[in-house]
Amino acid sequence: MPKMKTCKSARKRYAFTSKGKVKYKKQNLRHILTKKSAKRKRNLGKSGLVSNVEVKRIKTLLPYV
């Protein structure tokens, strides 16, 4: 049976914590930052956690993590 392939786009976007949770970097912090408030930019800089509903789907995209 052939090896399962890792979804390369998912590999770049998600990282697993030691307890098995999935974290990601939030969007909207690349350009057009002048109209965004300091509070919004500060919160966008923090990494977020994926909800438990979507973790199973991400694990199918990343079989060897």
UniProtKB/Swiss-Prot annotation:
GO terms for biological process: translation. GO terms for molecular function: structural constituent of ribosome. Pfam families: Ribosomal_L35p. Keywords: Ribonucleoprotein, Ribosomal protein. InterPro entries: Ribosomal_bL35 (IPR001706), Ribosomal_bL35-like (IPR021137), Ribosomal_bL35_CS (IPR018265), Ribosomal_bL35_sf (IPR037229). GO terms for cellular component: cytosolic large ribosomal subunit. Belongs to the bacterial ribosomal protein bL35 family. This is Large ribosomal subunit protein bL35.
